[in-house]
């Protein structure tokens, strides 16, 4: 759209209108770009009636809200029954004869149709579309009708692309959307952006004048606040309630509430929150988190900058006390910016929808919505889409896709920077043709989706002020997140975190064993936990699973919680270059230096290295005398490379430092050092929160490994978790036995029995949870006496020959002490026997009576171990009976050898043999 708006500006147009098909998807970007190019924008929507297409334009705010209603009505298929209030001056209607079948009917019927549907609108036009290839006869007919029935005509070309040869782009995009194919690769179309001279040639003077009249009549401003912060439902003022709950909450925390530092910090934060009008926001978030905890839903310790707030800690929104970690409130809520703070919340992923449902019930369905996202066509997708639309050879498509690597570069940059891609383009004509076509569609929106975490809440029904659309059963906004926030709608991120589900499952396993564990009370400086981390046994640990992170743990010889916080901040492209220096300084192998001695208290915890954004803020406060609010503005400006703001704040920093007695050249040196690290600074609040979550998982793994691994494996079952083999390798290293499924202990999850992990029956292909639950009921009547007893008792459950075959191959029947080959050879006879014997089953107990038909003998066969393992792998996706690699072990304190999956990051794997 940017290119099109730029072209409109270049051709001398002062006003442009936009109308999407029954939606308002493009409005925010359109309004933003026209404002940027100083062009007046007119907001509209195309509405399809059974026999006509009408474009409605918003004259004012009320008109815009009518467009929102029209979008909703059209999506519901109710537009034919909709009537406008008499003398409606809030919207303008333009009927498009060229795209309306009603214009083929007699004038009197046409006039009646328009009058029926549009009579309430004060100003209705007949839109004249005249393109280079248009037939003049129908256009003249439209003008005659308009004149006869007193409808003004207006120049109304539907512009679909910038230049005539761009018509093929539209065709390709439509073919992608419809799943169709094309043969033509070039096309000239008439719905391009005409010059002003072409407009004058194609339309009557009065029709051009009417475009000016519409422009003058439409004075709607898109850039106003329409969202209203939801009021927390209570019988007292939100400010009073927030203060009361904060004081009560802090008193219940394991801290000395009488300390002046806590009292002053709490009062300061509450005052800022009250002044900025955010009390309701905090109460709303605290309420649904409290609900989650009451429902025993696992809640994360915090995320983002919210752990920097003592109020958030007091309300139970976070589990991080900001004072001992030197976390800053202003990093979370800067009073000088007056923008809504972000309180992102993590819940066990399996329960995320329960939280959203609670919010819907509490505040009303019409006040809550999911948020739309738009996916654009990136380089690899463009190649694949062109390949499908034009049926190019799969060989060429795969060659180009592979040459694009991770696909992060656009096609033009890929040609310049990726030799293999350039070679295919230069030497293969088909590849060159694919790339040229792909380049045409690159960057266009391909499809919409739903934001993974965000929802919006509003005081009034959303459909009154915001266009919505249904995506399956869910209602989502038509505007993306950044535009919603700009319009004042409250966004809350409710994230589902698999790691919280793992922790919750692990704690439940421990509860079943009679072990009650409260993670809030575990010691945070446990040597055994750090010993585990140093060994590199980090599979399943949040943030720590990569081989690079394992090496980093060994490099710094992690032995304290602050190391973990630092590593989570450092282990990113750029900052990770400092890991070696951090390790050497910590171990006394490199001198610890500071930018200035007065900055030692700030930089000492990180051995003189700037790691956190909060440190930049504290340096600005200490050296230049900035308030923390101004220091946060300083941090934001340099991290976002906001040159204009940076220039002013740089001078302010230097002046402030000089006024505090620092030499100007020294102050400049510190400023330049900050500038160097600004790109790499990490949010310490987020790092502390996620380090806490990571440490909790490490604690469980250290002291309750069987329950931990059971939880990890349960979370991986049925997924494409590529780390599964890594989990199993660690189990062998720790001498924790992972056993095949066992028909005597049928389960839908990995279970712990005698310090062994037993795989669930649902691990098998074709064995569904419902069937396992029925097997459990049979097993509760008594143990299976032998193979024949088992097959007979399961016969009424419709456990098929294939089911039994899979159970044999998985090792579920190994408990009967017979070779798997024998069980396979005897299965047919067992099924025949079961068909007869099952008629004798006791209806009450489900057991065979002591006297029944004689058992038939087993058909003995010799096991072939590798065949067994092959079949086991086929039905379960893993080998549980024994390790194929035998006695291989990675040295406990040796170098970390990456898996092939990890090595794919460098596209290099070295093998020996």
How does the language model describe each region?
Residues 1-18, 22-37, 72-164, 255-284:
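Domain-core and long-helix interface of multi-subunit machines
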Residues 2, 14-18, 161, 237-913:
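Noncatalytic, beta-rich nucleic-acid-contacting surfaces in large DNA/RNA-processing enzymes
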Residues 24-39, 167-171, 313-323:
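Glycine-rich loop at the start of a catalytic domain that most often binds anionic cofactors/ligands
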Residues 29-77:
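Hydrophobic or amphipathic alpha-helical targeting/insertion segments
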Residues 42-45, 53, 161-166, 174-216, ...:
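Phosphate/diphosphate-binding loops
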Residues 51, 137-139, 163-173, 313:
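Histidine/acidic-residue-rich catalytic or RNA/ligand-binding cores of hydrolases
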Residues 206-232, 376:
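Structural signature of the thiamine diphosphate
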């Amino acid at each position: 759209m940017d290119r099109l708006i730029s072209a409109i500006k270049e051709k001398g147009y002062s006003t442009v209108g936009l109308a999407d098909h029954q939606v308002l998807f493009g409005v925010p970007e359109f309004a933003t770009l026209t404002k940027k190019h100083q062009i007046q924008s007119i907001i509209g929507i195309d509405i399809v009636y059974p026999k006509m297409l009408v474009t409605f334009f918003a004259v004012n705010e009320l008109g815009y809200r009518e467009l929102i209603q029209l979008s909703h009505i059209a999506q519901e298929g109710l537009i034919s029954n909709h009537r406008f209030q008499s003398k409606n001056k809030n919207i303008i209607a333009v009927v498009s004869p060229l795209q309306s079948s009603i214009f083929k009917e007699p004038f009197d019927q046409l006039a009646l149709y328009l009058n029926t549907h549009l009579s309430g609108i004060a100003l209705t036009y007949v839109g004249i579309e005249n393109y280079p290839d248009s037939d003049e006869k129908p256009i003249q007919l439209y003008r005659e009708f308009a004149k006869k029935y007193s409808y003004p005509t207006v120049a109304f070309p539907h512009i679909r692309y910038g230049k005539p040869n761009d018509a093929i782009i539209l065709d390709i995009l439509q073919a992608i959307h419809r799943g169709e194919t094309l043969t033509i690769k070039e096309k000239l179309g008439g719905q391009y952006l005409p010059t002003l001279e072409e407009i004058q040639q194609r339309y009557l003077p009065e029709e051009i004048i009417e475009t000016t009249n519409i422009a003058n009549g439409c004075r709607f401003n898109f850039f106003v606040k329409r969202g209203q912060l939801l009021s927390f439902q209570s019988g007292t003022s939100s400010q009073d309630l927030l203060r009361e709950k904060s004081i009560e909450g802090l008193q219940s925390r394991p801290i000395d509430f009488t300390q002046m530092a806590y009292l002053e910090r709490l009062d300061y934060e509450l005052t800022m929150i009250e002044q900025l009008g955010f009390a309701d926001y905090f109460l709303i978030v605290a309420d649904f988190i409290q609900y989650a905890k009451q429902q025993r839903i696992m809640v994360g310790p915090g995320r983002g900058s919210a752990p920097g707030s003592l109020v958030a800690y007091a309300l139970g929104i976070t589990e991080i006390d900001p004072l001992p970690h030197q976390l800053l409130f202003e990093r979370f809520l800067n009073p000088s910016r007056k923008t809504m703070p972000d309180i992102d919340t993590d819940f066990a992923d399996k329960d995320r929808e329960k939280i959203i449902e609670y919010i819907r019930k509490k505040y009303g369905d019409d006040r809550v919505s999911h948020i739309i996202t738009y996916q654009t066509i990136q380089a690899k997708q463009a190649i694949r889409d062109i390949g499908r639309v034009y049926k190019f050879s799969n060989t060429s498509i795969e060659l180009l896709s592979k040459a694009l690597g991770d696909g992060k570069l656009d096609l033009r940059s890929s040609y310049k920077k990726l030799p293999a891609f350039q070679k295919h383009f230069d030497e293969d004509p088909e590849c060159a043709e694919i790339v040229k076509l792909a380049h045409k569609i690159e960057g266009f929106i391909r499809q919409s989706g739903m934001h993974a975490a965000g929802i919006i809440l509003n005081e009034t029904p959303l459909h009154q002020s915001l266009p919505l659309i249904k995506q399956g059963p869910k209602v989502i906004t038509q505007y993306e997140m950044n535009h919603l926030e700009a319009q004042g709608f409250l966004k809350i991120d409710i994230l589902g975190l698999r790691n919280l589900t793992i922790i919750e499952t692990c704690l439940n396993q421990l509860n079943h064993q009679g072990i009650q564990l409260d993670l809030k009370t575990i010691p945070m400086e446990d040597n055994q936990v750090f010993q585990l981390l140093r060994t590199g046994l980090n599979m399943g640990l949040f943030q720590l699973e990569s081989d690079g992170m394992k090496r980093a743990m060994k490099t710094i010889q992690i032995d304290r919680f602050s190391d973990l916080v630092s590593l989570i901040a450092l282990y990113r492209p750029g900052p990770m270059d400092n890991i070696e220096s951090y390790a050497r300084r910590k171990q006394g192998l490199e001198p610890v230096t500071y930018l200035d001695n007065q900055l030692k208290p700030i930089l000492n915890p990180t051995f003189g290295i700037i790691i956190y954004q909060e440190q930049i803020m504290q340096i600005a406060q200490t050296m230049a005398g900035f308030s923390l609010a101004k220091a946060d503005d300083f941090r934001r400006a340099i991290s976002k490379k906001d040159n204009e703001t940076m220039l002013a704040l740089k001078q302010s920093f230097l002046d402030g430092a000089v006024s505090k007695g620092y030499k100007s050249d020294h102050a400049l040196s510190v400023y330049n050092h900050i500038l160097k690290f600004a790109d790499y600074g990490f949010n310490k609040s987020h790092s502390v929160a996620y380090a806490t979550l990571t440490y909790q998982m490490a604690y469980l793994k250290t002291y309750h490994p069987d329950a931990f691994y059971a939880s990890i494996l349960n979370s991986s079952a049925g997924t494409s978790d590529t780390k599964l083999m890594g989990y199993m390798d660690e189990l062998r290293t720790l001498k924790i036995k992972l056993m095949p499924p066992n028909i005597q202990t049928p389960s839908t999850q990995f279970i712990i029995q005698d310090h062994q992990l037993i795989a669930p029956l649902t691990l098998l292909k074709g064995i569904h949870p419902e069937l396992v639950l029925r097997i459990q009921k049979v097993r509760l009547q008594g143990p299976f006496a032998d193979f024949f007893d088992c097959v007979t008792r399961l016969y009424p459950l419709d456990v098929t020959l294939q089911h039994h075959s899979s159970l044999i191959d998985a090792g579920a029947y190994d408990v009967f002490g017979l070779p798997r080959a024998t069980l396979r050879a005897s299965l047919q006879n067992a099924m025949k026997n079961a068909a007869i014997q099952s008629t004798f089953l006791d209806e009450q107990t489900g057991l065979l009576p002591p006297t029944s038909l004689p058992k038939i003998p087993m058909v003995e066969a010799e096991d072939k171990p590798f065949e067994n393992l092959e079949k086991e792998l086929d039905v379960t996706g893993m080998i549980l009976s024994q390790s194929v690699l035998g006695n291989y072990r990675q040295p406990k304190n040796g170098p970390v050898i990456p898996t092939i999956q990890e090595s794919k990051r460098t596209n290099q794997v070295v093998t020996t043999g």
